[in-house]
Amino acid sequence: MGVPALFRWLSNKYPKIISPVIEEQPYEVNGEQIPVDTTRPNPNGEELDNLYLDMNGIVHPCTHPEGKPPPANEQEMMLEIFNYTDRVVNMVRPRKLLMIAVDGVAPRAKMNQQRARRFRSAQEAKEADEKKEEFRKQFLKKSKGDQEIHEEVIQKTWDSNVITPGTPFMDILAASLRYWIAYKLNTDPAWEKLKIIISDATVPGEGEHKIMEFVRSQRAAPEHDPNTRHVIYGLDADLIMLGLATHEPHFRVLREDVFFQESKARTCHLCGQAGHKAEECRGQAKEKNGQFDEKGKGTSLKPFIWLNVSILREYLAVELYVPHQPFPFDLERALDDWVFMCFFVGNDFLPHLPSLDIRENGIDTLIAIWRDNIPVMGGYLTKDGHVEFKKAQLILQGLAKQEDAIFRRRRQVEEKKLANEKRRKEEAQARDRARKRRRSSPNYEPSEPPASNRARGGGGDSAPPNDVELIIPGRGELSRENRELTHSMVVNRGAVYRANMANKSAAAILKSKLMKGSQEGDDTAESTPMPDADGASDSKIEPTSPSVLGKRKAEEPEGETDTPADNTDSTPKPSKDDEMPPDTVRLWEEGYADRYYEQKFGVDPQDKEFRHKVARAYAEGLAWVLLYYFQGCPSWNWYYPYHYAPFAADFVDIGDMELSFEKGTPFKPFEQLMGVLPASSNHAIPEVFHDLMQDPESEIIDFYPEDFAVDLNGKKFAWQGVILLPFIDEKRLLAAMEKKYPLLSDDERHRNTVGREVLLLSDGHPLYQDLVANFYSKKQGAPKYTLNMRVSEGLAGRVERNETYIPHSSLVSSLEEYGMPTLEDDRSLTVNYEIPKSNHIHKSMLLRGVKFPPPALDNADIQATRSKAQHSGRSFGGAPFRGGHGNRGGRINYASDRPNPFAAHLDPNFMPPSNAGAQGMPSGWAPPVPGSANFSRGPPPPPRGNHRNHYGSGHAQQQGYQQTNYGRNDYYGRGQQGHQHQGSYGNQSGQYSGRQSGYGGAEYRGGGYQRGGYQGQGQGRDYYNSRNQGGYGRY
């Protein structure tokens, strides 16, 4: 899930990170379909090594798709999953490895969110079924028992909650994936050299984090290729941040193009047809293909897009570079800080801070505060997945100063938006009333229905009936009968129109609604993504159906939600969308913090210590999330124990926090099922546990409320609200379940065990013979075989014999009736795979020998990004930047005659670092010759566009550390030109002016960081690319 709307925000702010996927399609020759030859070079221009599939992003849309009927049964669902996966593999064409990761048991911190979503999904499915039954009864009463419709609408909504570890469905999915992979290894030549790792739902951990654990383990191997090309597919927005967290520069995220869905939905507003804009409309009627347009174009395949993490790194390198920061710029550490700041705006484990919203550019606000505080912090916020809270305290204090202004501005925007919506509705209602008055007039002359009505079935056909005589100029007069008929129609046209409107069949309307209700019910599954502001899914399982508070579908016209009666009042009624409950917290008014804690937490508004307690728990959560992204799960049992987040102003003295997490153990699959599923989904849980969920006398019956509150929390729709469910008491749950375990069947016990990853490969892979000789020869080798990375083509780890696999046995299919055959001789190999564990933490650094792709940003992109970085995120205050022609990028001058907002945070004994380089420079000193030992060391200048030496490209140590001395942060930039920056310190306190013969030609002002700034006296030269940045002069 990650940050809602992050994908749209990133693609709008950094447009070059998105590029379309070039996908070859099968073609027909003499009526025979010829598949794509994926052994040929990749049409996207680059060969890719490893493909990782976050499989839940495939399972959910295949089992309950949008825009078409769902599969009839689980067998058809498996076929849909096979076809979708095959399409993704064919477009990426990985040459070395495919990893399929299904969500297993999640950490406790994630289970709270899963519980809320599954309870909401079950409630919506129940409401959809109730609506179907109500419509069915109405229709049968009107239509006198149309059996066809009766059978069509009585089908219950498929419960997507079964896509949870431990259910029979997930057991079927795991077995089906193993069969399909083995089938492809036996039949597809493109898979011959491919290694496939399957981590199914029996292996604990979320799919994307199991993938990240694998990537980190391979990076730690001595023979790992630092230029491995990675692609990860999934619907979660946090895959972007996980890609950055790997510090693998050759990384792409693959996903469906949600913007294509929007462009497809947009039609010409004049004629209602797709394919052209209003200014291109010629008013032509829609051409039907077939008598009823049944041969029209079907649903087209959704295109895919790349999100290029390497280009995102380029953008962030420009945006996060702060001129004259008092320590060397380190892009990898800066990227970690950026990922950490994204957590404040939203993640799967913590509610976002009230003052931060991605749609209000909350990340930009944090970046601006971060840039302003870099000189004060003296270093980065994070290091290798650990937060330095003393520095984080400064960021939160900077945000706290802007909170009041943010809330007031948000209210102003909302009021303006509501006023505009009200005005548009009133104008539309006025037009409708005028139209009705015209139609009620006896002289009303209806015009030809617009093409949009014809396209939607609301008007006439594009061709007249065969028995009506056409009026064609030049062919003479009409017959007498038709002439009299035409005269009568013209004279009585108003009455004819009103009669036709009144004679519409109520049964037909009900039938239409029944069909629509059936489709809506199918879309209530939890993981059909609810489009957020970016058109993308902000979670795997956001619903698309009307919410529990009655969210109206976008395509459902207002005023048509009920079958019209003869005596329907034409007076417009206010829609449900206008009936929002009042926001009693009123964040835009004085005293909002007291009201917030009193209403949301139920505590005394004067209890300040409680606020600090919530803030410390939230800070602990931030530390947990960062470790989870960079090092793996730090604790399986930790969770944030509140439904709401604190304000930034409540983070007091968090710099003194000392955190330690107890690792713990993950839940068993049935324990997670009991922790996240509602009682209405008990069909997915073994029957022995049903009483615990349904019996009023059950010791944990309070965990399964039938009704629960949804706090809109200032939002408009229930899917945006906060689900107020009681948190699970782990000790009570496990104690109650322990009594039932002896009653489980053998099959149920098998589903409740912890599984292992499996590795599959074909007999054409070089590793095949080694493994067969070790495990299946007469002279067997060690039970655990350590892979030789040269033979395995880059795969590190250990493997063991899989007890269920028999070499060259038959590959049995359970889908033979669907065209998936049983193979008599299975030539693939299956072994258990163990991801290698490292004794060292994952370092935020580039690996030795990495080679960067050519820069994607040109000089215009860099200048635009730098300009935005200097001014964005400052809508609500904050330290300003100097503007003007001669002051580009200059910092504000905190001298003796100006207050320094950072002074309150400084140690009274703080002294700026000495500059030994300035003291040893003789008069007339010149910079070293390019290529000499001390040339171009220290922080690099901002990137210079498409220059061939951009960020030191072409040298083995680009953007990286000196490998033998991690932490020193020395950069080797021999590829860069030496841009001299000659600057003499002025006499004014705390600033210097300079002439530049090199980069930028801009004047920089000094950034003194004690209360009165520093005084730079005397002469000195500041050489931008020297090891030390000029001199501070005499303090």
UniProtKB/Swiss-Prot annotation:
Q: A GO molecular-function term, please?
A: 5'-3' RNA exonuclease activity
Q: Where is the composition biased (Basic and acidic residues)?
A: 417-432
Q: Name one GO cellular component term.
A: nucleus
Q: Name the segments for region: Disordered.
A: 417-470, 515-583, 865-1035
Where along the chain is composition biased (Gly residues)?
880-889, 997-1019
Gene3D superfamilies in UniProt = 1.25.40.1050, 3.40.50.12390
Its localization reads: Nucleus
Is the keyword Nucleus assigned to this protein? yes
Grouped into one coarse class, the protein's main location is nucleus
Name-wise, this protein is 5'-3' exoribonuclease 2
Which gene is annotated as encoding this protein in its UniProt record?
A: rat1
